[in-house]
Amino acid sequence: MAIELPLTVHILYHKEYKEGAKVYSNLYKMLCRDSHNPFASGLDIPVYFHTDENDTSLQPVPTNLSAKTFILILVDQNMYLSKEWKEYVINTLLKQQKDTVQICAVSLYKYAFEFSSELGACQFFSFGNESLLLHWGEFQTRLYDNLIRFLNIDGLNQLRIFISHSKRDICSHGERLAKDLRDYLLQRGTKLSSFFDVNSIMEGGDFESQILESADKAIMIVIFSETYSSREWCIKEILQAKKNNRPVIAVFDIDGDIDRVFPYIGNIPATIYKNDWTPVVNLLLRTTLGMTYQKLLLSKFPDDLNKVAFAPDAYCLSNIPAENRNKEMLYPEPPLSYDELEILKNINGNKVNIMTPMQFNAKDCNFKQRSVAISISESEDQHQNGIGQDMLDDVTLEMLRHILIANGKIVYGGNLQQDGFTERFRDLSFQYGQYRHLALGKQEPNNPEDERYMTAFIAWPFHLTIDNDQRSEFKHCRVDIHFCKPCDMVSPEEAKSGVEGTDAEKREKRARSLTVMREDMESSKYSDGTNEDKELLARIFIGGKTVSSYGSKPGILEEFEISLKHNRPIFLLGGFGGETRRIVDHINKVPGKEIVGLKQIEFKELNNQVTDKNEIEVLSNSTNIFEIIPIVLRALNNIAK
């Protein structure tokens, strides 16, 4: 099922801008996901970056990846002085601007506004020409606001914040905070308006209808003070907002005990006021952007589903019309815990599934604890596709996360280089163990600490540096580690002490020992949880360096040839560049892209049961995980049957 994304964001900066990579990484975590915490909630908005690295020519920003495209140009002194960047912006970038493409710029230099008169007509964010990282909170506010209005599903040109608060606290604590927030919105020039009942209700108008109508259309901040849950109008306001699927957050500021917490204030983001309203407003805007984006994304799924753009609760279920209560329900990632879902299903009479988009795509998938190998490394050309390290980490960990959720296991081979994928996958295995405990509830095995979700093959001589502390960490994270033997060039003494010889001999020994590891991975048998050992279910390739660090050929290419020799089902995700892209181009017989020494094959020889031409095209070229992952999951499920 092809899913058109509602929005993609593209960051453009000069290669000499020192904070460019950091800004991109922060934006990726802010708008998409934090790949180091894959089971946490994210907004799912893909973020790409574009720069002039390696003096490659600047290419047009791809606007066919999503329904709308937001382009953010970081204009620093280096870009201001660059003739190439100026010509690119004027002759290429600005000509792409249309209703579905919005361009904004950030002034990082005092003369940035002079960079291009044509660009000057676009919106500029300015923060006193100082480091963007020093003004990150204010930048978040402005970016969130722009993205919400760009998506604009409610037809609003200005966001209005409804400040829901109690006036009955001791010393009017909640009311004073509400007034302080109102004044902040007025004085800081946030371009956000507020609904504050003392000032916003027109004289002579119906009090109740004005409040409820405003709650219908605004985004809401709840000032949760000690008397909030006991005030009738506070309850009316929040129920009205939730009934109409409005974004709501809570700000906790309690001075004393609470007799009762109103139960239907749950399942919303919350924070604590710490004498600064900027983080509070940013949490509300992030929540609003997330719900806006999710409404558009979920609308791409079949119409015979109930869809909510937030984590569902009992009040949400009560608002579903009777005629729709037999429909399955779709809500955003990440999945709710087992116990929470059980409560919701019981309320609904256990009639329907309540699931996330990825669970919907894999709802009938069961890999029967078969093992799937992943081959991945960074590539030299990933920047040419706008792909940063955060995106590569993200797509890989999302793929593995859903394989684990579909009752599969992971196999990976590495050399424990600093910042390598081995340790990231180890951390994922640990987090999945925690998630599985919540997700399965009473179905959790009697001895969950004995479960293993991943097998890590570590080549000689790299495993010689692993101490007992590291081994304990792998065990704690439910990872089996397999220390591979060295190649036949290595003597028994050298196998214990480490690689010896000339530089050329050392490289050759490492290269051949990596080959031994790859052959071990491919030929080993893996437990499927039924006391029966089976071969790998399949292997997935992503990225990969195009030049080997040790041997005569890139590691990804060698692993591909070994898998091909064993007739292993293979998935090539070519959209992320690297050696995987080169293999895809070789199969497609792209002129000038042939790989010397690699035999010519057809896609059907990958044995992955993906036969539809459109799906082959997606796997070969797409970076959209909502397209890629369901195709891979369905194919793996067919192979596992």
Stretch-by-stretch model annotation:
Residues 16-17, 52-53, 61-112, 168-169, ...:
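Conserved beta-strand-loop-alpha-helix hinge of the TIR/SEFIR fold
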Residues 20-25, 83-86, 115-117, 173-176, ...:
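A short acidic (Asp/Glu
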Residues 175-199, 206-292:
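Polyanion-binding and phosphate-handling cores
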Residues 106, 163, 194, 220-221, ...:
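Residue-level detector of buried hydrophobic side-chain packing
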Residues 1-33, 57, 78-81, 107-186, ...:
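C-terminal interaction surface of TIR/SEFIR-family domains
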Residues 29-41, 52-63, 68-72, 76-86, ...:
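Acidic/glycine-enriched connector segments
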Residues 159-223, 304-337, 370-408:
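Conserved small-residue-rich
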